Amino acid sequence: MALAGLCALLACCWGPAAVLATAAGDVDPSKELECKLKSITVSALPFLRENDLSIMHSPSASEPKLLFSVRNDFPGEMVVVDDLENTELPYFVLEISGNTEDIPLVRWRQQWLENGTLLFHIHHQDGAPSLPGQDPTEEPQHESAEEELRILHISVMGGMIALLLSILCLVMILYTRRRWCKRRRVPQPQKSASAEAANEIHYIPSVLIGGHGRESLRNARVQGHNSSGTLSIRETPILDGYEYDITDLRHHLQRECMNGGEDFASQVTRTLDSLQGCNEKSGMDLTPGSDNAKLSLMNKYKDNIIATSPVDSNHQQATLLSHTSSSQRKRINNKARAGSAFLNPEGDSGTEAENDPQLTFYTDPSRSRRRSRVGSPRSPVNKTTLTLISITSCVIGLVCSSHVNCPLVVKITLHVPEHLIADGSRFILLEGSQLDASDWLNPAQVVLFSQQNSSGPWAMDLCARRLLDPCEHQCDPETGRREHRAAGECLCYEGYMKDPVHKHLCIRNEWGTNQGPWPYTIFQRGFDLVLGEQPSDKIFRFTYTLGEGMWLPLSKSFVIPPAELAINPSAKCKTDMTVMEDAVEVREELMTSSSFDSLEVLLDSFGPVRDCSKDNGGCSKNFRCISDRKLDSTGCVCPSGLSPMKDSSGCYDRHIGVDCSDGFNGGCEQLCLQQMAPFPDDPTLYNILMFCGCIEDYKLGVDGRSCQLITETCPEGSDCGESRELPMNQTLFGEMFFGYNNHSKEVAAGQVLKGTFRQNNFARGLDQQLPDGLVVATVPLENQCLEEISEPTPDPDFLTGMVNFSEVSGYPVLQHWKVRSVMYHIKLNQVAISQALSNALHSLDGATSRADFVALLDQFGNHYIQEAIYGFEESCSIWYPNKQVQRRLWLEYEDISKGNSPSDESEERERDPKVLTFPEYITSLSDSGTKHMAAGVRMECHSKGRCPSSCPLCHVTSSPDTPAEPVLLEVTKAAPIYELVTNNQTQRLLQEATMSSLWCSGTGDVIEDWCRCDSTAFGADGLPTCAPLPQPVLRLSTVHEPSSTLVVLEWEHSEPPIGVQIVDYLLRQEKVTDRMDHSKVETETVLSFVDDIISGAKSPCAMPSQVPDKQLTTISLIIRCLEPDTIYMFTLWGVDNTGRRSRPSDVIVKTPCPVVDDVKAQEIADKIYNLFNGYTSGKEQQTAYNTLLDLGSPTLHRVLYHYNQHYESFGEFTWRCEDELGPRKAGLILSQLGDLSSWCNGLLQEPKISLRRSSLKYLGCRYSEIKPYGLDWAELSRDLRKTCEEQTLSIPYNDYGDSKEI
């Protein structure tokens, strides 16, 4: 019944709404109430055309042109975007959001004010009269009718909401009253013993009387004008033969009502009966003989049993009627007060009736107090109550959500050309709305006002107008008003102060105390915010917004973010370090003012790390206290030469003894002892010496850690335990047990592997016993002795540095000769760590610094040898003054060796297998005194081991009685030393130290393909120095000698796979003016290989000849436009991606003398003789003068030489010129002879000067953009094919005397 009433109530609520909607027309109500967004574009063209359109096309477009006054009476932000070209017209974009009924209320108007201001006002429909230029939005035709219906609709719905809320509050009040009322049981009426014996009281559980039954019972009682009382018991009693006093019961019920319904509150829930009050109870008809009440109770019980119990209804009805018909007394018609009739009309009261529907009659009065779970005060809310509350809340929410008006918001976006808005423009916004200048790249100095409503006063917003210099931390508008400032004052957070130059920025001035290690020890890779690289020049301290305290940018464009930041720190850091194309110098002055020249200066600004004046600064044992703040120091450091113990309780020498605090008792089997050893030079400092010991009756083993019983006897008197480890440095093939450095290709000093001789290990041809696990393979004799001789090449040492090049002799030549005898292949099968390495590793664990691991690698190497070859090797290097000498000696050697060497079939070959080697021939020339054949020839020889007697090619022979001692020739297979470590943590740290030692000089960590340098590995310029930058060696080309105007330079491109990324090479060219002092230069030119040479920017005088590819790493460069007979100095640097430069490499060379065509000079000499012979006319004189004047100094020298050689009998050249041309003209011609140096003058007097030409290929590149940070050197040759084409250049040379054989 209650749910039906609720449904009817909802129907009443929604009914008028539907009628109103229908009366308004055939319009969908949901469409009328939905939120919509409408965008309108408003152009300023009409007003600019009517007034002064010429301001948009002014030549000085960079200056502000127009004053704006924009006012918005609606809530919504104002956005200014200067994204238009200077020739485009400004326009407004209005984004109106709200109900469809509210959007037409928005009006706007544009007006040109007298002071030249463009006014744009957004206002309400009724907020301003209709003015010219006022544009309305679209309005529906029946707006007034809809407005009235909307008001009526809202009124009806408001009444429904209030009614529903009242019902809900009433239910909650009654529920609260029932919960806090104390339950009380009414005393049962007394009855006689005869009635107790003759009749039996049957109790029907109240849960069996469902909601429909109780409702019908109530209706029957009301219709019959009869009332019945209620007993405050859980079950409804049916009294058979019960006699009672009606007056007493009536008084009891009246007391119950006057007591506030305590028994009423003890029922399960509330019912609609409770709304009838106590008047109904007091008006009940309790007169005996009320048959209507009796029949109503029987019908009620019948209906309830049929609805809730599967028991046969006929049987139940018969049982009940037998009781009612046999009784002649009056019974009280009781109605259960359970609230399930209202809360659960379907009959589900939430009790055990569903689980146990069988009807039970109780005859024991004490059992009638069975309680229902629904009526338990611990669970007062059942499913029905929750359902009612949910339905009510849902209906209220539905009604409210369907009638909540969308707020009317108007967002204005002003699109203008750059610099169009003039300073002094004003914007008036509602309070709470903001001006968005994020897309306003060049904001003007505008004035902002805020107003509470469209008619309220304007208040100047001093903080919001700070568009050009927004406050970094916070803004105080009140201070600006009090001091009459144009903008609000910027304030800084606690611990910060204003920058002295930029008042709107803040710098930190309080850093607090830090006792302990410097908290920012991790240097992450720095990133250029544009290119993503790692250069740096200075160190700064700034804060970032992740709460970590500080970060250390290393330059204004390169930052080092902490580990928590992403690769692009500008997206998350509140700094002015952002470097963009349009904002490079955002905070340069501020950074300069707060910069530090070095990391030490930065750390000193934070004060001392500890107070060492008392109690050693809190440092324990033999730690020294230092107050200087270091990046990786806690203020407690160990004395020099000592390392901290694993528990940091003291310092010890890790090279001596053990560490008792390592958690493993120092590796000692029994005792680990400590002893204080003072320093001899400073008694205040001492070393904690730790060593192993044994208890009584035990002695220390040979390993210094194990203990053995003193009484223990060993067989045959030998030592107990493992066999003693022997040093392997005096053993054959002993290098196999030592460490190896795979970079330097040298054997380390420390023994890595244990060598024992417990097994009889011998090899064929060797008398000595070999260590255990060593496998030796002997190479056959016919494959042992091999000779190698290289092709003669220019001496590389001559081609670099100070090059004493002579165009007469050319390059000196170097040739290598080598004989190698590989005798044994050695392999190590068994690997066991030596005691020395074991002791060193045992002192290292996760708490040890990288420096300790690097020291171990320096001692034991980074690899251990697995396979190697042994034998004998002899090498000789032979230098020749030029290639002609080498050619003559080699041809002579071939003739001699072929003529004097015995044939393979002769008996002499068998008797004396010795053959003549080329080094022996060179030695014989020196010994025989044939100086003219060996002038300028020298030879140096080196040997490894002793030459075996089976090899006839050895230059230095040894006595046949001396046994051959094979030496280590080459390590063919090696493994990292960290693979020998079993502890995972120690192995990982040793591997990291190995990588750091190989690529980062031991002062940085390898991160992917780059080195993260330690704080101590930064140079004076602030650049990292841990990854050594390879030095390119600049040299003259080995193929093309310098000419009079051209030099070919080359170098090898070398880039390690980790730590360094070469991005460019810089070449400096200087002209030396003083031949004795090369520091005096006249001109200087610096060229970038990437930007100037291969890009084609300066290709006329510098051209690439060869670039690297996948096979070759040589870079060859052609330098043209040089002056003959001039000293030039070329300097080369390599540049990596951090901006570092490698150590320079120099080449100082003098260009050859000017090239002359001797054939042409002789022809000119013949021509001059013919002109001067006999009578010389004026025309012939002028021809001779013009010819000689245009020759130039070198050719004039050769003309003079040939003229005097052939025609001196008719007069010397100088005299003939003066006689034929006159002194003045002859002086002008002969003055050119002094332009050359004495060296070139001497060369031009050679009787024979030949001219030859050499072809040189080069790359002619047209201009293109080369990105150095994305340069792939291995693919450079392929990439340049797109912009460069191969061309040929002809180079002239002079050969003085006999022609060279190049």
Curated annotation (Swiss-Prot):
Extracellular side: 22-153, 403-1302
Gene Ontology biological process terms, A to Z: locomotory behavior; neuron cell-cell adhesion; neuron migration
Limits of the Fibronectin type-III domain: 1030-1145
Disulfide bonds: C463-C475, C471-C490, C492-C506, C612-C625, C619-C636, C638-C651, C660-C672, C668-C692, C694-C707, C785-C951, C876-C941, C947-C954, C1000-C1011, C1013-C1026, C1101-C1121, C1153-C1240, C1261-C1284
Modified residues (Phosphoserine): S227
Positions carrying Omega-N-methylarginine: R337
Domain EGF-like intervals: 459-507, 608-652, 656-708
One GO CC term, this protein: clathrin-coated vesicle
Membrane topology: Multi-pass membrane protein
Membrane-spanning parts: 154-174, 384-402
Region (Disordered): 340-380
Position of the signal peptide: 1-21
Residues glycosylated per entry: N115, N453, N729, N742, N804, N984
Chain ranges on the Cytoplasmic side, renumbered to this chain: 175-383
UniProt entry keywords in alphabetical sequence: Cell adhesion, Cell membrane, Cytoplasmic vesicle, Disulfide bond, EGF-like domain, Endosome, Glycoprotein, Membrane, Methylation, Phosphoprotein, Repeat, Signal, Transmembrane, Transmembrane helix
Subcellular location: Cell membrane; Perikaryon; Endosome; Cytoplasmic vesicle, Clathrin-coated vesicle
Family annotation (InterPro entries): Annexin-like, ASTN1_2_Fn3, ASTN_1_2_N, Astrotactin, EGF-like_dom, FN3_sf, MACPF
Keyword Endoplasmic reticulum applies: no
Entry-linked Pfam families: Annexin_2, ASTN1_2_fn3, ASTN_1_2_N
Record keyword Signal present: yes
Similarity comment text for this entry: Belongs to the astrotactin family.
Subunit structure of this chain's protein: Interacts with ASTN2; the interaction is not calcium-dependent.
Entry function: Neuronal adhesion molecule that is required for normal migration of young postmitotic neuroblasts along glial fibers, especially in the cerebellum. Required for normal rate of migration of granule cells during brain development and for normal cerebellum development.
Name this polypeptide is given: Astrotactin-1
Organism, scientific name: Homo sapiens
Gene: ASTN1
